[in-house]
């Protein structure tokens, strides 16, 4: 009850006091192409042009300015660098909200156009901003190509990592992205800017390590859309296609889209699991793995903006996947002291079908200088997983795992400027989650250790937070504190398991201090504490059969893992430096051990492990040389982690080195060529060692009016092989893969008057990531 009162109190406190003599002017600022202009200056001056009061436009181009209404009220002046100012006499009457259009100064010079190289990246406090629109980055082609050209960002398929920080939560036009396939509909020429937040404040959930915000190009009213298709030829063909439309009319915006994909790959693998004992035991499994995934997605959204002060809307999205893994020619061998004492051919097939329905409703309101943002997310989903394993002599095992889940999350986010250099951000979250699963199996001519099971997880999460932002001279500071209460209950059947159920009361502080001595340099130091909560699929004790000598098990007693991070980000002109030091407590990993009294069956089980430290440091540099833009990045890192292997401490501390060499040639007629070379050195992740990896990409892209084409050749000269080795207890578990990483990729997209001017979707809960 105390927790609920605390959260409610923080939500209702909103200092909204207005002077009786003040009135407000509201409006939206556009450029002469119909794009909204953010951070434009809007000021009131008196008749002698003396400053009275002022503000800047929001990322949506809107402003709300309290003004002093007197007999001679002066003027309202709107300005932005590179654009002609707009002046309105406040003595006249006018209709609100104002629609102010600022003209680019270049349009006033007749046919003389001066084109310069715009800075690609800018550091501001703990944020790296990539200016994409009207720069060479707009010709990167696919979103993956673009993201891998942003300092310290890597990844693909809509999932991206920040060097030294880990996986980033991605937002598209302020809407959190839960399905990476959504990002495959976007090309670089549709993106306005990208922000990389390297030290998120307390307004973000405690399990968020980094944030990437992607903003698309804005346009005025009308109907527009985008359609795309792509094919990939590796060992097999894959295809991806979709379309989206948006209609803006005055105060209304309607959006919709549909997407479909079919990805197919083929990989050759060999697993070698050794039990180091007397006698020495070895299990090998050689396979040809065929992967086939089908994806279908549909979405619809409506936004209504009755005034510049408030917006209401909802978005709903349904996604369905079907994952099929097929191993038709598994060759299984067992050796005792080098003697092959068991051999069989096997078949392994798995099918995973998750379906999700996510609906987001949001409402934003400005009261005086205070902005209130309310969102509610409802997630309903099911998942069916089936596994069939067969050997010679009619040995068969089949398992079925079905899950149903529900989540409802309400988030309130409030921003109040206290002075021109001090602001307060505060709010809270209340989330209810339920995850129920059943597990059953059949076996023929073999006895396993599995059992039928039914279990359920329920969680109530309450959070309250506050962030104080202030600027003193060339210094700026963001200090925040987040309180989270989580009550988690675990049931077997309908019986609550008290030993596994538990409550958490946690405080998560954050701090970021930045120094900005001039326009070309910036340094930022920060601290943040984060938590890793186990996925609901891990929070059970079900034993699942993988093969005759290999089982996998969850763990209902998993605890939260906490990390304290010290982060640094600095820049000087086109040179950037990033660093971090993490103190990790009770991390979650898949530990290997023998199953029960068995001497040769290996169990891989989720568990909390001992504390350790991670460190990372990276440097990035880029520069324009005419049509050529090189981009160089190098990163170093490691961990201080030890674990028992063969009854002695084994140190997994070998440092790693990564580097990127990216080359872009910007040619005439909207034609560009890019050549990427990436290297990821041998590295450790806890007690798992992964060998080095090379990636290359040669891409050609071209815009022809509303059409965009990209042709890429990937990893042609790179080795396919990669090895992963886990050393734990008396077990050496190695996996060798011959990957399907060499391919040719073709993308074709068409945009017709594409518009999306409001970007109001505000899905915020991070609990969805646990399902």
Model region roles, listed by residue range:
Residues 30, 43-45, 79-83, 95-136, ...:
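Short, acidic, small-residue-rich periplasmic hinge/interaction motif at the N-terminus
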Residues 48-62:
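Short, acidic Ser/Thr/Gly-rich low-complexity loop/linker segments typical of extracellular
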Residues 97-101, 111, 143-146, 180-181, ...:
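N-terminal periplasmic accessory domains that precede
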Residues 149, 176-201:
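Short acidic/polar hinge/loop motifs at secondary-structure boundaries
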Residues 297-323, 346-492, 516-519, 575-579, ...:
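Face-selective signature of the C-terminal outer-membrane beta-barrel domain
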Residues 350, 453-459, 499-502, 531-585, ...:
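Outer-membrane beta-barrel signature, preferentially recognizing the C-terminal barrel domain
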Residues 382, 436, 485-490, 515, ...:
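Surface-exposed extracellular loop regions of Gram-negative outer-membrane beta-barrel proteins
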Residues 407-411, 553-555, 559, 565, ...:
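Outer membrane beta-barrel strand-and-loop segments of large Gram-negative receptors
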